[in-house]
């Protein structure tokens, strides 16, 4: 594995903070595993894993690692396959998330001159509000449409001269098909498409790009770690770039 000295120090500080919390989910797991700190790669490899069920068992606020007075927001997984996972956010978490998402926009070539139409859902889901926070921090104009109402989406796309469209891949495909069907491609100014929450194969991506004439970007994220915006592909199309000063990614052999 590859991990820098700076990253080890960051992990060590966080681990020691969690161990000191008497009734905290992660602190308890670390103490049970005999962890006292992380000063080497060997120490890092000894950290215990957490699985989805572990996070569900912490419902509702067992994952909070700060006093409740410091929690400014919660988000939640859908809970369609079991108890939802609730993630508490501090003010700093919200700010850091916006910084990462703003980077995603910049990586995709979005500027403060752009008009960004945001169609992912809001509410407990992390998608819409994440797209909006990064957009506003960057300084672009957010058009917070939310999901559905395709007729209005297309009307705003034309009236507002939207230049960046954000959506799930399936909704982007629906919009692309409607633009073709209605023959309005010459009435829109889209230049970028950023999708998230769903995987899209090369065939679907090409279909969307051909119909809308846009550059296609795909973000990465998950509710348990900030939300969407912790990574994005670049214009060269060689996989995802993850913000390693915020998130350390390790690929684990399940065996």
PLM features per residue range, with description:
Residues 86-90, 110, 127-130, 155, ...:
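Short, conserved acidic/polar surface loops in the N-terminal third of protein domains
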Residues 1-76, 82-99, 103-107, 188:
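Nucleotide 5′-phosphate-binding alpha/beta core
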Residues 1-17, 138-255:
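Active-site glycine/GP-rich loop and adjacent strand/helix microenvironment
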Residues 106-140:
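Conserved AMP-binding loop of ANL adenylate-forming enzymes
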Residues 82-89, 113-120, 156-157, 162:
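Short acidic, glycine/Ser/Thr-rich loop/turn "cap" segments at secondary-structure junctions
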Residues 71, 94, 121-123, 170-171:
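Short glycine-enriched loops at secondary-structure junctions
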Residues 93-94, 120, 141-145:
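Short, flexible loop segments at the rims of nucleotide/cofactor-binding pockets, characterized by
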């Amino acid at each position: 594995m590859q991990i820098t000295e700076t990253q080890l120090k960051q992990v060590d500080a966080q681990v020691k903070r969690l161990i000191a919390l008497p009734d905290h989910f992660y602190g308890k797991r670390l103490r049970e595993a005999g962890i006292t700190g992380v000063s080497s790669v060997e120490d890092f490899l000894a950290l215990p894993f957490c699985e989805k069920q572990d996070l569900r068992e912490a419902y509702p606020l067992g994952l909070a690692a700060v006093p409740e007075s410091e929690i400014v927001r919660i988000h939640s997984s859908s809970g369609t396959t079991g108890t939802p996972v609730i993630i508490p956010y501090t003010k700093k978490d919200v700010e850091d998330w916006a910084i990462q998402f703003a980077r995603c926009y910049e990586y995709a070539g979005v500027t403060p001159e752009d008009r960004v139409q945001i169609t992912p859902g809001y509410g407990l889901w992390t998608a819409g509000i994440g797209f909006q926070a990064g957009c506003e921090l960057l300084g672009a104009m957010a058009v917070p449409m939310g999901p559905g109402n395709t007729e209005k989406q297309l009307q705003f796309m034309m009236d507002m001269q939207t230049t960046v469209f954000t959506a799930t891949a399936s909704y982007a495909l629906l919009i692309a098909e409607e633009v073709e069907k209605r023959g309005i491609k010459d009435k829109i100014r889209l230049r970028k498409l950023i999708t998230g929450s769903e995987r899209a194969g090369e065939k679907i991506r090409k279909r969307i790009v051909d119909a809308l004439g846009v550059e296609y970007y795909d973000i990465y994220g998950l509710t348990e770690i900030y939300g969407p915006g912790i990574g994005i592909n670049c214009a060269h199309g060689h996989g995802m770039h993850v913000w390693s000063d915020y998130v350390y990614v390790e690929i684990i052999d399940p065996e």
